[in-house]
């Protein structure tokens, strides 16, 4: 059976000048970062201008699976009250003692949330749409394993599904017990995606002493890394940018009200 293709869509035409005020939704990229940072802040946070989409709904669900709580305010889907999860993050585990997160096709969920699972009280299995299984994840997983997290690929190496857990809890201890202020250190090949670098930066404030990250290779989408750094700084988190490593100081900003600004579509990076 065959069907003929649909004809052109008859777009409506105005009969005269239009005057209106349009409230633009927040940027998907900024919404993802705002949700994550609110989920691990030092106190409750109010978010305004939140973009509602499948990707951001999946991010909210993933963070809820790690202990954060989100409440819609005033009946507005774009306004949320976030209550952060304490460390170690409390996984909503099943009978097998493992949590499960559906990343869908959201690159921000599949890359930003696994570092948080390394700071949780139980392992988490990440999986998503069939197309998501074709997207690279290996460099981030390698970096997490280097930092001491438990990492296991349950299918093709460097691809979803993967299990990430705290291992022996190395990331929740100082990198150098004799010098508690010294940061953890790691290198990541971010040439395949700037999200690998952003993922580590977003988790960095939660590590005792912070994290110094060295990006290996040419990083694409540098504006999205700058977006991540700006989001951290706006919340009072110190970020140093020397020639090589990039490392936020430990300590996540306290809760307050944040408005997610509109932005141009950028693939949810």
What are these regions (language model features)?
Residues 1-269:
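Structural preference for solvent-exposed beta-strand-turn elements
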């Amino acid at each position: 059976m065959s069907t003929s293709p649909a004809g052109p869509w008859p777009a409506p035409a105005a009969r005269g000048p239009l005057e209106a005020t349009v409230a633009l939704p927040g940027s998907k990229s900024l919404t993802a970062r705002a949700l994550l940072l609110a989920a691990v802040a030092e106190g409750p946070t109010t978010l305004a201008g939140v973009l509602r989409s499948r990707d951001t709904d999946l991010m909210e669900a993933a963070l809820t699976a790690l202990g954060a709580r989100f409440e819609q305010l005033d009946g507005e889907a774009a306004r949320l009250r976030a209550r952060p999860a304490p460390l170690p993050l409390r996984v909503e585990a099943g009978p097998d003692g493992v949590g499960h997160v559906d990343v869908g096709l959201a690159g921000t969920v599949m890359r930003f949330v696994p570092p948080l699972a390394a700071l949780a009280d139980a392992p988490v299995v990440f999986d998503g749409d069939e197309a998501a299984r074709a997207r690279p994840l290996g460099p981030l997983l390698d970096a997490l394993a280097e930092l001491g997290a438990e990492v296991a690929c349950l299918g093709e190496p460097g691809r979803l599904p993967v299990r990430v857990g705290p291992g022996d809890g190395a990331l929740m201890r100082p990198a150098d017990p004799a010098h508690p202020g010294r940061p953890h250190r790691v290198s990541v090949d971010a040439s395949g995606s700037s999200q690998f670098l952003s993922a580590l930066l977003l988790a960095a404030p939660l590590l005792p002493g912070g994290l110094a990250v060295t990006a290996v290779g040419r990083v694409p989408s540098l504006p999205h890394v700058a977006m991540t750094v700006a989001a951290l700084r706006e919340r009072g988190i110190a970020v140093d940018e020397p020639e090589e490593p990039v490392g936020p100081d430990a300590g996540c900003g306290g809760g307050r009200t944040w408005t997610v600004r509109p932005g141009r579509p950028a693939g949810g990076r």
